[in-house]
C-alpha cells in the first residue's frame, strides 16, 4: 500500500509540475503576443509620422550615418561653416574663431587627440569626429541645433561655452567642467560613444519599446516608441524627449506648451544640410 500511495503522490506531483510549466509557458506566450501587438502599433504609428512629417521617432538617424568619423574632411567642414555663416562679419564668427585645445589620450571611446594652441572650429570638429568615430555631419548638426552657431551673426560667449548642449539639461544649469567650444565638441563626440557602450545604464534602448515623454513635465504625456537603432537611442539619452503632434505640425516653428524640439530639429537641420538622416 505504501508503494502504491507513493506512486500516486509521485504522479500527482509530476502532473502538478507539468501544469505549472504549461501555465508559465501560456502566460509567457500571452505576454509576448501582447508585447508584439504593442510593437506593431508603435511601428505603424512611427511609419505614419515618417510619411506625414518625414520624422520617425524610432529611427531619427541611421547607425551608418551617425558612426562615421570619415564623413567629412577638415576642408569640407570648413566650407560648410563658411557657407552657413556667410552673414556673420563680427570678430566672434565661428568661421574666424580659434581655440586652444588640450591633447586627449586614447581611451576605450576615442583615439588620441593632439591639441594645438590655435585650432579652427573646422579642425576641432573634424578631429573630434575622426578620433571618436562620430560623423562630422552630426557634430555640425548638433552645433546648429543647440546654439545656432553655424548661422549666428553675433554669437555670445555663452553660445560657445555651451556649443553642443553637453551637460546642459533642460531643467538644470550647465556643468562648468564642460564649458568651452573644444570641451563641448570633443566631449560630445566622446559622450556619444560612452552612451553606446553603457546603454544599459540609461532608460532608452534599441530593439525594444521605450516610453518617451513629450516634455520634462510628465503631465504632458508621451508614447511608446520602438527604437530601431543605437544612434537613435543615444539621441534620446542626450535629449530625452520626442516632439508631440503640435511640434511636428509646426514644421520649424513652435507648437504648444508641451512641445519640445531637440530631436525634431536635429532631423530637420541634418536633412537641410546633408539629406535624409536615415540614408
Residue locations for each model-derived region?
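N-terminal export signals and maturation junctions of secreted/periplasmic proteins
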Residues: 17, 32-122
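Mobile, glycine-rich extracellular loop/lid and propeptide segments
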Residues: 97, 110-111, 117-154, 158
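Hydrophobic membrane-insertion alpha-helices, especially the h-region
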Residues: 15-32
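Short, small-residue-biased leader/transition segments that mark boundaries at the very start
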Residues: 2-9
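Catalytic and binding regions of secreted/periplasmic enzymes and modules that target cell-wall glycans
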Residues: 139-278
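Soluble non-cytosolic domains of exported or imported proteins
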Residues: 71, 115-123, 129, 133-137, ...
